[in-house]
Design a protein with these regions (language model features):
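Helix-start/capping segments and mature chain N-termini
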Residues: 1-70, 89-268
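Ordered, amphipathic secondary-structure segments that act as subunit-interaction surfaces
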Residues: 77-85, 95
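Short secondary-structure junctions
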Residues: 73-80, 201
């Protein structure tokens, strides 16, 4: 079941349109206990993307929220990821539906995952604009390399962001992340920065060179599906086992999630 321009359609979400023909902005967020996680932040970012592209907004924030809950009410106990996408071909088309997701296991959340670097950049990093070509390349890299995520590297050898995530690294108890001007300003990324403030951790926007990945004390990604996800290995280089700062940040972030969603309709 998905929602399209005023109608609930009894089938799974269709494939994304060809971005060469149809410009499309989108947002993806998790649904817990019949509640979308950090929905207002996602919708505000979507509207910023539309403004940066110079397109008209055919729906208000309140209208999109109302249509979203029309969909959620059809399957109130379902959990997962929902995509909201807005395309213009030739008239605006708003679609809302569940998409496949992959959440990390408990072991991955505690012990970390393997990632690899991948040389590619987003042309419009501050706009969440569908890029099918880059997504296909990163998906193939994930499959070929057998890793949880790929970290994008620019022409200067600097790590910018993940294929679906932002990334952070720790050095001498200071938290670093790539400059926001070169990445998608992730919702979870901002929550991590907020968590660092609660923990009195200093945060600096500074690139990590691909050649220096073995010099960090800790590294993790942040994103919709994974939340705060520790990294154990990069390009086959094993990182230190101590992930204490990552775990502290992860704990505070998880508290933010619980506060945001609250109890379900049954009180738990």
């Amino acid at each position: 079941m998905y929602w399209k321009n005023g109608k609930l359609i009894p089938q799974e979400f269709l494939e994304d349109p060809d971005p060469m023909l149809v410009p499309m902005v989108y947002e993806v967020f998790r649904v817990y206990r019949h509640k979308p996680l950090f929905l207002s932040e996602h919708l505000e970012r979507m509207f910023r993307s539309i403004d940066l592209l110079g397109f008209d907004k055919p729906y208000s924030l309140d209208q999109i929220q109302d249509h979203l809950f029309e969909l959620l009410d059809t399957e109130p106990d379902r959990i997962g990821n929902i995509k909201i996408r807005l395309s213009w071909w030739p008239d605006p088309i708003l679609e809302i539906g569940y998409i496949p997701h992959r959440y990390p296991t408990e072991k991955e959340q505690t012990e970390g995952v393997n990632v690899a670097t991948f040389h590619a950049v987003r042309n419009t990093p501050n706009i969440k604009l569908w890029n099918a070509a880059l997504r296909a390349r990163t998906n193939q890299a994930l499959k070929d390399l057998g890793v949880f995520e790929v970290l994008l590297v620019n022409e200067n050898g600097q790590i910018t962001e993940g294929g679906r995530t932002n990334h952070f690294y720790v050095k001498n108890s200071v938290l670093y992340t790539a400059p926001v001007s070169s990445v998608l300003p992730g919702i979870t990324r901002q929550k991590v920065i907020d968590a660092a403030g609660i923990l009195n951790l200093r945060v600096i926007e500074k690139y990590l060179l691909e050649s220096k990945v073995g010099s960090v004390d800790e590294m993790f990604t942040s994103g919709t599906s994974a939340g705060v996800q520790p990294i154990a290995m990069v390009n086959g280089i094993l990182l230190p086992e101590d992930k204490s700062i990552t775990i502290f940040v992860q704990h505070v972030y998880n508290q933010m999630v619980e506060k945001e969603i609250g109890p379900n309709n049954y009180g738990w």
